[in-house]
């Protein structure tokens, strides 16, 4: 007779997203509009940071990815605010009996410069996740002229989350 496994005390999830960039701003990232010469092209608001965080949360609970939760061919997701995605992922994390220990993310963008916006983005993400700002790490890196990010043709983000059993 097989016994039911005990729920894991900790779970880790990894998320990634990228979008092509188009002319004219603003760029929506971390739930904020960042002024600049570019905007991300996508079916929703194309917020790469929130998409990566959503996938990290869903991955940590072995849930479906953002594309299965919010298909890009569904009309209701056209122009949709990515905060909705984070909200649904957080609801599922809570429903699974977990809470967020911390989130760490990196934004990959040549332009616009992210450094002036990092603290505001950390605060916005912490509020969305119902955590403290100390639980949200965020960095930004440029592409140094290499690949689509470095040529300002794309923007990307990676996120990792650690959950603990409540």
Curated annotation (Swiss-Prot):
Gene that encodes it = ispF
Provide the species name. Rhodopirellula baltica (strain DSM 10527 / NCIMB 13988 / SH1)
What keywords appear on the UniProt entry?
Isoprene biosynthesis, Lyase, Metal-binding
Binding-site list for a divalent metal cation: 17, 19, 51
Task: Report the cofactor remark.
Answer: Binds 1 divalent metal cation per subunit.
Q: Tell me, how does this one assemble?
A: Homotrimer.
Q: Which GO terms describe its molecular function?
A: 2-C-methyl-D-erythritol 2,4-cyclodiphosphate synthase activity; metal ion binding
Question: Which reactions appear under catalytic activity for this entry?
Answer: 4-CDP-2-C-methyl-D-erythritol 2-phosphate = 2-C-methyl-D-erythritol 2,4-cyclic diphosphate + CMP
Q: A Pfam family for this UniProt protein?
A: YgbB
Q: Where does 4-CDP-2-C-methyl-D-erythritol 2-phosphate bind?
A: 17-19, 43-44, 65-67, 109-115, 151
Pathway of action: Isoprenoid biosynthesis; isopentenyl diphosphate biosynthesis via DXP pathway; isopentenyl diphosphate from 1-deoxy-D-xylulose 5-phosphate: step 4/6
Identify which cofactors the protein needs according to its UniProt entry.
Answer: a divalent metal cation
Among its keywords, does the record have Zinc? no
Write down what this protein is called: 2-C-methyl-D-erythritol 2,4-cyclodiphosphate synthase
Leading EC class: lyase
Q: Which cysteines are joined by disulfide bonds?
A: none
Sites annotated Transition state stabilizer = 43, 142
Q: According to the UniProt entry, what is the EC number of this protein? A: 4.6.1.12
From the UniProt record, give one GO term of the biological process aspect. Answer: isopentenyl diphosphate biosynthetic process, methylerythritol 4-phosphate pathway
């Amino acid at each position: 007779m097989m016994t039911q496994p005990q729920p894991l005390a900790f779970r880790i999830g990894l998320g990634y997203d990228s979008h092509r960039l188009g002319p004219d701003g603003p760029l929506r990232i971390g739930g904020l509009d960042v002024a600049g010469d570019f905007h991300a092209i996508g079916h929703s608001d194309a917020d790469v940071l929130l998409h990566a965080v959503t996938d990290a949360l869903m991955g940590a609970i072995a849930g479906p990815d953002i594309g299965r939760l919010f298909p890009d061919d569904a009309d209701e997701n056209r122009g949709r605010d990515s905060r909705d995605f984070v909200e649904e992922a957080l609801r599922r994390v809570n429903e699974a009996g977990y809470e967020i220990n911390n989130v760490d993310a990196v934004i990959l963008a040549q332009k616009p410069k992210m450094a002036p916006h990092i603290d505001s983005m950390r605060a916005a993400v912490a509020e969305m996740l119902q955590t403290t700002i100390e639980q949200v790490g965020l960095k930004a890196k440029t592409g140094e002229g290499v690949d689509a990010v470095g040529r300002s043709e794309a923007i990307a983000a990676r996120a990792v989350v650690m959950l603990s059993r409540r």
